[in-house]
Structures are given as C-alpha cells and as structure tokens.
Amino acid sequence: MSLGGTEGSGERIKFSPLKARILMMIGPVMSAIFFGFFSCGFIYYALELGISFWLDMIRENFMFILFFIWIHMSLVESIYRMIKNNLLLNSNIQELRDCYPELEEDWQNLNDADYFDKDLQVLVYGDHLICYRTFDIAYLPECSKIDAFMKASVFRLSRFREVRRVHFSAWYLDGNESELRTDELRKFIGMNQKAHKDALFDYLRENFDYIELETFD
C-alpha cells in the first residue's frame, strides 16, 4: 500500500484498545508521579521549617506561589482529561462492538477494513472512520463535514521543513463535533501527509459524497 487503500497481503496490524488506553495515560500518570513527589517534599519541608518561615516566604515570593498553584491546577486538568478520554474510549469501543459483532470476537478483523492507511493511522470499517491508535471514531452516515488539520510540530528538521501530523474533526448533522486524533507520540518524519490525507478524502468523496471535506494548514 502506498497512499492508502486496502492493505492486501502486507503485514497485518495488531489492534489493541488497551494500547490506546496506555498511550492516553502516559502523560497524566508521569505528571502525577512527578508533582506528587514535589508536593510531598514541599509539605515535608514546610513542617520541618515551621509555618512562620513559609508565611514569610509567601510574602516575599508571591509569584512563586502562584506558579506552584498553576502547576497543580494543570495537573488536575490533565487528570480530568485522562478520565474523560477513557470514558470516550469505552464508549467508542462499545459502539464498534455493537455495530460489528465480529469485533467482539477479535479486533484483528479491522485488518479487513474497506480503506486502510497504516502510515496515516486511519481506516474505514463499515460506516465508521477510525483513527486506530487512539480508537477515536466517526459514524460517517451521520457526518455533515470532516476537517483535516495539518498540525506542525515545534521541532524543525531543517530551515524549510518541519514535522507535521494530521488530525481530523468530524461534524455531525446535529451540530456535535468528534475529534479524531492520531497517535501523539508518533513522528511523521519523511511522510507526505498531504498525499495520504488526499487519498483518504478521495475515498470518502467516492463513497460518502454527502460529506463536506476541508483542509486547514
């Protein structure tokens, strides 16, 4: 497979909702461990040095205290996002199992998808568009529009080239939006993402011609 399409006789992908869950939790868990140790150390020294010392320090280092509070608020937000994404993952997995009973038996049946691009990490199975590393899904018969966002990484390979990855958003007829994220830890180095995205959009135009498709660079 070059720029999308069915996989044919190539190497089969091992699909794993558990792996998607682990990738989702790495960032928040590592942050929780780091800031947990930091907070424990802070409390220990506060008790050891005495409250009066820390009251004086707060008066003299007010901006530091604000930074400390902001860091922990960010941690709480990260944990909330992890819980929310896990609930969404559970819902997506259940929806796929309900629509396609064969996936209840074996997720590897996704290798028989109607459209499969392992470089872009997307496939179309039945009536669902799936980013299979994160198990984000869109139910195509109820979609009115799909946007592709060509996100640039902060790391530049050279002066004129930068690492980019594609994320998708699906808009439904009722106005709701569903984000389809590719794997955040994957680096799309040396891959013509625009060509892969165009191949996917060509397939969607041919098979789901009522969906509006748009790209944002």
Feature roles, as predicted:
Residues L120-Y125, A138-Y139, A170-W171:
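Short, exposed beta-strand/loop patches in secreted or surface proteins that constitute
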Residues L129, Y139-F155:
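Phosphoinositide-dependent membrane-docking surfaces
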